[in-house]
A protein has these predicted regions:
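Surface-exposed loop/turn and secondary-structure junction residues enriched for glycine/proline
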Residues: 30-31, 36, 73-75, 86
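Cys/His-coordinated zinc-finger cores
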Residues: 90
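Histidine-centered nuclease catalytic patch
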Residues: 52-85, 94-106
Length: 134
């Protein structure tokens, strides 16, 4: 789909990133995160009636699909808008795009993860629309 995604490189592994990755993994595997996901899904269903992937618009399922963190600044205290529903395939594409671009990584390092997320989602939607037209 996107040429640049094939040659992706993971960001450098610094001690700070390693520690952050450990905290993230611990949170994502916790019962508290599973409760937060359920609360998020319940609230989103009340707000919009149904939940769809932010990229491809396929129905989102709590057990099968992912919530992308548009911000890590409130890890463990996420606001509703910090979480973006995505099917597993689209979530992987978003992370591949981040990994493939040092520009995206620099923006994230400066605290602009939400902007990067929104921009990548918009670009992926454009690419998917072009694929449908062909």
């Amino acid at each position: 789909m996107a040429e640049g995604l094939r040659n992706r490189q993971r960001p450098r592994r610094t001690p700070g990133r390693v520690a952050a990755a450990r905290r993230y993994a611990a949170w994502m595997n916790s019962p508290a995160w599973r409760r937060r996901r359920r609360r998020w899904a319940s609230e989103e269903t009340r707000r919009s009636g149904r939940i769809v992937c932010a990229v491809c618009s396929k129905p989102w399922h709590e057990r099968r699909d992912d919530l992308h963190h548009a911000s890590y600044s409130r890890m463990g205290r996420e606001r509703h808008e910090d979480l973006v529903p995505m099917c597993r395939a689209c979530h992987e594409l978003v992370h591949k795009a981040i990994d493939a671009s040092t520009a995206w990584q620099r923006l994230i390092a400066k605290g602009h993860r939400r902007l990067v997320t929104v921009s990548i989602i918009a670009r992926l939607k454009e690419l998917k629309d072009k694929e449908k037209q062909q």
